[in-house]
Design a protein with these regions (language model features):
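Nucleotide/phosphate-binding catalytic cleft detector across ATP-hydrolyzing
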Residues: 1-172, 180-300, 307-362
């Protein structure tokens, strides 16, 4: 899935017709914020984390500095992800974080108010859309256009959305997974589910706590998933792959090191992976037969950071008998799709939602 192709060639209407130098594409994710700048490409990739003082709510750090505090802060400091499962959990902190990142990307000379194309989960409500638009307006954005996350991911991995042909994209973020069937630039069937990166991490935390009475943090669980996680039962040699894990003994309260094997992490992830595959199957069952036939021929594309789980395409193929592959750079698929719309907004006007329906400025 290399290369970039156009979507439906819809003439611009003035609002969309010409990109400006400081126009941006934004992937505001649960775990990371990525920004694409017109004419420059990907200019920012930072953790969506804010560290605050617990009593005063004073912001102490944002992005990388805040991420380093996760699980390591004293009791008076909290490291918070202001977005949960793809939606805004803390309006004020999301605003502060976005303004910080925008100021870092745009020079003061250019910051006359950019226009922004932002991705949103396919199941997001009008109220949640309006919250995002208000946050961007408060952060200094001139105008916001929303792009369904599956469409952004499809553009980013190089799908030609002009075709009267069924394609399936499964975009796996930290908080949410968007499953969508796309044809002629429109989402025909979709589902947003929580079987995503954080859900996998939580399953690892629970498994290790139950089996070893060992408490580990979310960052440790993520590293375990990256290093030895697998969606398929490991072969003999692979099953013996192990890594030392440091946690806190639930009984004594003292630090302890435990060796964890790949076979154990497969057991921890077996049910979450099965639930994800079941959700993909549910979308396929609701898909019109001709489009489903196209997908059986052409396969499923995985994007998003959580798509990096080892042997996940193989697990999907084994269960559904449909070819499955991962985008070349799954973490950037969505923001690159937003960037494509930013570079040629007139051609993608039919995909963009200006969010005006029932919108009220807060």
């Amino acid at each position: 899935y290399n290369g970039v192709y156009g979507a439906k060639n819809v003439p611009g209407n003035g609002e969309y017709a010409m990109a400006q130098l400081n126009d941006l594409g934004i992937d505001l994710g649960t775990s990371n914020v990525l920004i694409y700048q017109q004419g420059k490409g990907l200019v920012l990739r930072r953790p969506a984390v804010v560290a605050i003082e617990r009593s005063t709510k004073k912001v102490l750090a944002i992005g990388d500095d805040a991420q380093r505090m996760v699980g390591r802060t004293p009791s008076n400091i909290m490291a918070i992800r202001p977005l949960k499962q793809g939606t805004v959990a803390d309006f004020e902190l999301t605003n502060t974080m976005l303004r910080f990142f925008l100021n870092g990307v745009l020079s003061k000379r250019l910051f006359s108010g950019p226009r922004v194309v932002m991705s949103v989960p396919s199941g997001v409500t009008e109220t949640e859309k309006h919250s995002l638009i208000n946050i961007l307006l408060d952060a200094g954005v001139k105008r916001t256009y929303l792009l369904d996350r599956p469409l952004a991911a499809a553009l980013g991995v190089g799908m030609d959305l002009r075709q009267r042909y069924g394609r399936m994209i499964v975009d796996m973020g930290a908080g949410i997974t968007d499953i969508a069937v796309i044809s002629e630039g429109e989402i025909v069937q979709s589902s947003s589910v929580y079987y995503a990166g954080d859900y996998f991490d939580d399953a690892i935390v629970r498994y290790i706590r139950k089996k070893y009475s060992l408490l580990i943090g979310e960052r440790t669980a993520e590293q375990i998933k990256i290093n030895i996680g697998t969606a398929m039962k490991p072969e003999t040699d692979e099953a013996n792959l192990a890594m030392p894990v440091v946690g806190r003994n639930q009984l004594s309260g003292l630090p302890r090191t435990q060796e964890i094997h790949a076979a154990e992490i497969y057991e921890a992830l077996k049910d979450p992976v099965a639930a994800l595959i079941g959700s993909i199957q549910d979308v396929l069952v609701r898909t019109p037969p001709q489009l489903a036939s196209d997908i059986f021929d052409d396969g499923i594309v995985l994007s998003g950071g959580a798509a990096g789980l080892a042997r996940l395409p193989e697990a999907i193929y084994t269960a559904l008998h449909i070819p499955c592959g991962v985008a070349d750079d799954p973490q950037t698929s969505v923001v690159l799709g937003c960037g494509i719309a930013v570079e040629d907004p007139g051609a993608y006007a039919s995909l963009l939602d200006d969010g005006r329906k029932g919108f009220k400025r807060l």
